[in-house]
């Protein structure tokens, strides 16, 4: 039987493999951007390169923006969903054993039309800027540069927290798919992820520990 996964609305069957497939073009663009980063880093200073140093540096900037933004957006689809069909009966089809089919022609790019995917992408983007500035502070002995980086860390940390907390709060109060243990019926459960934290305190402790350690590392370096 066909079942369709739609963002926050219809019942669906999802697993990690189809979640990755649900954002196909996002993952492909992410992969391409990091390949572009590696090539640009290697060739920007080589003598006689055809594109010139500034072109490769521009590619590095593109990767620095596109990579974290889309990576966060793709991960967000694990919580917001993607538009595809699943037909598990195809697993027995030796000619075409593909169980996932797109619900539209965007092949995952439609994930960027969901504001919450973009919000987590922005959180990852600003966190990447924080980590980059922290690296400069801890690796380069230049007072003028480190002072600028400290200001950058503070500014980007504020933006990171705004977007990250917005996504976390929205996720905790959102409905999620659950299974009735008596009837095995799949239904939408209010506050699903918040309930998951309550029922699995170890996961909550790990999550909070990670957040606290990130903020501690930022504070220890900057203050």
Residue ranges of predicted features:
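Single conserved hydrophobic/aromatic residue that forms the stacking wall/gate
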Residues: 2-8, 12-13
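Extended hydrophobic/Leu-rich segments
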Residues: 12-15, 47-48
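Extracellular loop-to-transmembrane helix junctions
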Residues: 15-34
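Central hydrophobic cores of alpha-helical transmembrane segments in multi-pass inner-membrane proteins
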Residues: 29-45
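Long, contiguous internal "core" modules enriched in hydrophobic/ aromatic residues
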Residues: 47-222
